[in-house]
Amino acid sequence: MDLTPREKDKLLIFTAGLVAERRLARGVKLNYPEAMAYISAALLEGARDGQTVAELMHYGTTLLTREQVMEGIPEMIPEIQVEATFPDGTKLVTVHQPIV
């Protein structure tokens, strides 16, 4: 399989997002990289499903709560930016204060 660097990045985010999803399902609080991967993967999948940038900006704030992450993680992630592929091209999705 010959993947571009961009495709490798997306695959890594998706894989880390799956690990985070499984840990959440077991009740394990997510650390920084897991929280980033979980939200980023969800945003990438949402773009692939046809959601708009505005919808994803809101959706990104509903994925995790303070109770689901380790102490101090919400303050470490003031925003998340993901370059996602939409039906009409690639766009930057920015989610401010993703963990409430």
Curated annotation (Swiss-Prot):
Pfam families: Urease_gamma. One of its GO terms (molecular function) is nickel cation binding. It catalyses: urea + 2 H2O + H(+) = hydrogencarbonate + 2 NH4(+). One of its GO terms (biological process) is urea catabolic process. It is found in: Cytoplasm. Pathway: Nitrogen metabolism; urea degradation; CO(2) and NH(3) from urea (urease route): step 1/1. Keywords: Cytoplasm, Hydrolase. The keyword Cytoplasm applies. CDD domains: Urease_gamma. GO terms for cellular component: cytoplasm. Its EC number is 3.5.1.5. Heterotrimer of UreA (gamma), UreB (beta) and UreC (alpha) subunits. Three heterotrimers associate to form the active enzyme. Belongs to the urease gamma subunit family. NCBIfam families: PRK13241.1 (NF009712), urease_gam (TIGR00193). This is Urease subunit gamma. The gene is ureA.
